[in-house]
């Protein structure tokens, strides 16, 4: 493991990318759903992902109407909610686990739960839990001002998403406003595993890189070591793997088996980035 990463010196998303860039490395960013199969397994999974060399971990907060998510993550959210997982229980778990991690956590959540709690209160709660980043996929750029202001006030990096169908002017505005990194959605539609990565990603990466020096991470449909390697070769600063991770944890015969498979899979992705 990287000697620069110790639990007591966990830094934010921007600093993580800056460190990796100075080392000529690409960030591995796994995504898992909190509470699937249960929160105790989520806590163990976060530690496994961290120990296998993940650079940032996205943790999905289960929601009953997840518009951006494909079947695997929707099913994970349903299973988690049926178990009684809620925001407070996720925060309690994170308060215990985050001090033991060497990589930062970014929460992936929908806007409604933030609004219900109140934006300022939400930011205070996640900051106190040790969270460094936030992704809210269902908020259009025009409505992010309050979120961005409160996030900045609480030193939470609000990551914005851009897609292959985003017009260039709008993409530039998203790139300008995004903090931590820019999330480039590799394909149109919802999350999920795919056979290959959309080749348009390469030119989109070039376009974004021309507009900014901020790091760009690619996600949606990336599920194999060869996908990870391909996207890194195209010039991405980070690679996000979600549905494949979620399926391993949520659909294994037992939580223990899921954690073993998760470790093996994460190591295979990490190897693809360093080879």
UniProtKB/Swiss-Prot annotation:
Question: Could you tell me the Gene Ontology terms of the biological process aspect for this record?
Answer: auxin biosynthetic process
Asked if rRNA-binding is a keyword of the record, the answer is no
- Active-site residues are 58, 69
Q: What is its main location?
A: cytoplasm
Q: Which Gene3D superfamilies does this chain map to?
A: Aldolase class I
Q: Name one GO cellular component term.
A: cytoplasm
Q: Which family does it belong to?
A: Belongs to the TrpA family.
What is the protein name given in its UniProt record?
A: Tryptophan synthase alpha chain
Q: What is the lineage of its organism?
A: Eukaryota, Viridiplantae, Streptophyta, Embryophyta, Tracheophyta
Quote the gene name from the UniProt entry. TRPA1
